[in-house]
Each structure stands twice: as C-alpha cells, then as structure tokens.
C-alpha cells in the first residue's frame, strides 16, 4: 500500500501519466547483471557463453549491462563467485555511464555501498588510476569491501569515513566524483517493501538536508574542470531538482551539463522538472529522471555537474596526508622474503611485472601480517579508517606466505605458471570446499572456470587441497 501523501504528490507531479505510473507498481521488478571486463582481455567468447546460458537483453544505457529473467538465477552460477558479473538494478547503472570514468584518473565514489557503482567505475578505468571508494556505515563498508574483492579489483582503496573528514584531507584532489546519495528510496518501492513502510514526508526532508551537506563536501574535493555526478533512487523533488538547485545557488563555480537522453537510449519525458521546486536552477531540465512506467528499470534521478576552470599544466593534487610510500624496498625484501619466493614460484614474471607484483619497490603496504599492493598515486592513509588499502596479496603465517583470495580473483590464467581448469559442475563442488585428485607439479594453482579465476588450490601428494575461504563456501 503506497502512502497517501506520496501518491498525492506524485499525482500532482505526473498529471495525466499518473495512472500509468501507478500501474507500473504491479509489474515485477526488472533484473540485470553487468559483465566485468577486468576478468579477461578478450571478453567476446565468455560474453557469448553467458548470453547462451541466460536469456540476456542489452541495457541501453550500460555498455556491459544485460537484463535477465527471474528463471535464470545467475547468482547461483559459479561465474558469480568468480566475479564475472555483478547483479545490479538496471537503472542504477546509468550514473556511472554519466560519470564517464577514464583510465588513469583519480575518482571518488563517496557513498559507495554495496559497491555496484564502484565496480562499474573500475571496469571503465581498465584497472588504471585510483578509485577511492567510501561508505560511512561500518557494516555496509564491509559489504563494499567484499564486493571489491569478488570483482578482482586492483586499483581501489576502501574507506569507512565521513564526507566531512574526507573533504578536509582531499581538497581539490579528484578528477571525478560520484555522489549516489542516501535518500528516501521512493524509486525502490516496487523492489523493496521496507523502503515503502519506512517512508515519511519528514524523512524526505531529513534526506534532503543530509544530501546538501554531502554535496558541499564533494564540491571541495573536485578539481577545477572536474565532473560530479549526483544520483538518487527517489522521486522526491526536494531530494532531486531541489538538492541540485539549492547547491548551484551557493556554488557559481558549478554548472549543469545537459544529459543527452537519446544517446543513452532513454525515451522522451525523462527530463528534470523545473516546476516541481521553487527557484529551479538554470538548465535543470538537462538532468535525468528515470521513470518505471517509461523504461525497464526502477525510479532514479541523476544530474551531471561540471566545476568551472582548468587545471594548471602539470598539476598534481596532494592530499593532506601526503602520498603513501609503503615499505622501503630493503625492508620489504627482508621482512617479506616469503612473498617474493611465492611470487617467483607462482607468477609468470613477464605478465605480472607490469602490475608490480613481482619486484620489491614502492607500492607495497603491510597491515600487521597482511601485505597489500597499493594503487598508483595512492594517498597517505594515516588518520583514515581503511578497510582495504589496495589489492590484498596475502598473509604471513609462521614464516610461510599464504596468498589471499583477493589476489586469486585479480589474476588471469596467463598471469601464473599453474592453472587448474574446472567444469561448471566441478566449480560448484569447489565452492563447497571439495578437494580433487590431481597429478602435476606441486605448489599453488589458480583455480579457474571458463578461464575466469575462482580461487586457490595447492597440489601435494596427488591431492589438490581446496583453499576457497571457508566463510564463503556454499554449504
């Protein structure tokens, strides 16, 4: 049952389209997945295989996004655990398309959990540059970190910070910022009954006030000439056109970049609505409203903002914490000799030397007994709540090195000397913790399904010991 004050407002907002909008709530929610191009250099073969396995149809506004049917259940296929795709609501893919991330940039996903948009950003970055992905709530930040790991991401730093603290540290630091703002969730009413039950006009205003503060912080962190994308999953004007208009009234250095809906494959009638707020910002019609009665997705709003000005030639932004140097090479070689022994025995050096996984030098960071490979141009992490400072390489255990699950998921078969290929049925057994009889050279093996890494195995005495994390095993 939709709240009365919500339906009254929507009737005034939509006019003659209201009945069509209301009827959309009777339709089952649309479901989609987004393929992860970080898993393979050439995605064509595996993409066709996924398309043949599931009944996929292209999401118009997302290059690697596809609708699937409820019967497909891609979340139960081993490909999901291999990070070959991320299951994501189709409308939620639009903001990152609008952000247009580029390889080598510094990008911030400020309100990032559960991680769908962060993983989409890194796909577009092709693993190059720095993504700082942040979530203020600890439990949700943990889920964000887990999804960054599952998707095999190397160039992300996962934080659990407030926007205010980040703004103090990263003044004019990022080339692009995504603010997928916490909101009243009206666009998710069809998908999530709890969002409907918890809704109130007071909560809408509370969310709008919070969004104003988040946007203020984001503005401080964006470089001149940088792009900021603001998005919500609500229909509330106060949180959409209202938040953007309020922000622009205080920030003449920002302007709206009109969204080309036709180029995105979005139907007519999805413009921002100036009449729904007092004192609308110039160009507010150039923002985007995704309506569930007009397209195959839930309700979303997005605005693209540009910060005026240009960076001086050769400009290198510096965080208040400086840059992270990590472990000096001489100490790294001495303290982490077991890791480099593992790397020499396991990696094909010519494939992994570019990623800096084989040789001692700047870029390695130790957190206790855990070793990480930091993203390029990593800021200093002192004073920050860090969940994942980069790619987790592994752990020292009683003078031996044990590789991390995250490392396996970030590798490709061509990166390592030993690969153990499983069928889909064998992969399902591996995910349950099953060991396998095997012959071959003893040591660590990258376990793969359809040439997508799934985890580690260690061969000794004719047995491939299963090193898939016990906490992730499927029964």
Model-identified regions with their sequence ranges:
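Polybasic, low-complexity RNA-engagement segments
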Residues: 1-13, 17-53, 298-301, 308-475
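A short acidic, Gly/Pro-enriched loop at the edge of an enzyme's catalytic core
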Residues: 102-103, 165-178
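Conserved class I S-adenosyl-L-methionine
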Residues: 104-113
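Conserved SAM-binding loop of SAM-dependent methyltransferases across substrates and taxa
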Residues: 114-127
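Helix-to-beta-strand junctions that scaffold the AdoMet/dcAdoMet cofactor pocket
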Residues: 126, 222-224
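S-adenosyl-L-methionine
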Residues: 136-171
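Mobile active-site "lid"/loop adjacent to the S-adenosyl-L-methionine
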Residues: 139, 175-216, 233-240, 250, ...
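Class I S-adenosyl-L-methionine
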Residues: 174, 227-230, 235-366, 370-372
């Amino acid at each position: 049952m939709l709240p009365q004050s919500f339906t009254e407002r929507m009737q005034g907002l939509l006019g003659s389209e209201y009945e069509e909008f209301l009827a959309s709530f009777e339709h089952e929610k649309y479901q989609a997945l987004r393929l992860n191009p970080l898993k393979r250099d050439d995605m064509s073969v595996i993409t066709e295989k996924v398309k043949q396995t599931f009944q996929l149809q292209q999401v118009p506004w997302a290059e690697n996004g596809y609708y699937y049917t409820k019967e497909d259940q891609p979340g139960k296929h081993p490909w999901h655990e291999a990070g070959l795709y991320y299951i994501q609501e189709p409308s939620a893919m639009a903001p990152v398309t609008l952000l247009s991330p580029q390889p080598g940039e510094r990008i911030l996903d400020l309100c990032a959990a559960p991680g769908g948009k962060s993983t989409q950003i890194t796909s577009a970055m092709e693993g190059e540059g720095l993504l700082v992905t942040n979530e203020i709530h600890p439990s949700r930040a943990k889920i964000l970190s887990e999804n960054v790991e599952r998707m095999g991401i190397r160039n992300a730093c996962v934080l659990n910070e407030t926007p205010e603290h980040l703004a103090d540290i990263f003044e004019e630091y990022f080339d692009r910022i995504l603010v997928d703002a916490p909101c009243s969730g009206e666009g998710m009413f069809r998908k999530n009954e709890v969002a409907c039950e918890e809704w109130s006009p007071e909560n809408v205003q509370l969310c709008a006030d919070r969004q104003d503060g988040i946007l203020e912080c984001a503005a401080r962190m964006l470089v001149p000439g940088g792009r900021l994308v603001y998005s919500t999953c609500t229909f509330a004007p106060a949180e959409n056109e209202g938040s953007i208009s309020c922000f622009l009234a205080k920030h003449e250095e920002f302007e709206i970049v009109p969204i080309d809906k036709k180029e995105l494959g979005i139907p007519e009638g999805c413009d921002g609505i100036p009449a729904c707020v007092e004192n609308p910002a110039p160009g507010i019609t150039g923002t985007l409203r995704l309506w569930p009665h007009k397209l195959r997705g839930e309700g979303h709003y997005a605005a693209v903002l540009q910060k005026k000005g240009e960076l001086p030639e050769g400009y290198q932004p510096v965080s208040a914490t400086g840059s992270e140097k990590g472990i000096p090479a001489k100490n790294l070689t001495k303290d982490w000799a077991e890791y480099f022994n593992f790397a020499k025995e396991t990696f094909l050096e010519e494939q992994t030397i570019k990623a800096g996984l084989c040789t001692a030098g700047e870029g390695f960071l130790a957190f206790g007994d855990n070793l990480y490979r930091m993203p390029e141009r990593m800021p200093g992490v002192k004073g920050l709540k860090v969940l994942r400072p980069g790619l987790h390489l592994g752990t020292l255990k009683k003078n031996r090195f044990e590789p991390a699950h995250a490392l396996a998921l970030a590798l490709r078969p061509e990166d390592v000397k030993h690969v153990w290929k499983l069928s889909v049925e064998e992969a399902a057994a591996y995910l349950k913790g099953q060991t396998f009889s095997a012959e071959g050279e003893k040591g660590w093996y990258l376990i793969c399904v359809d040439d997508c890494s799934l985890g580690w195995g260690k061969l000794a005495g004719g047995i491939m010991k299963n090193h898939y994390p016990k906490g992730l095993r499927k029964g």
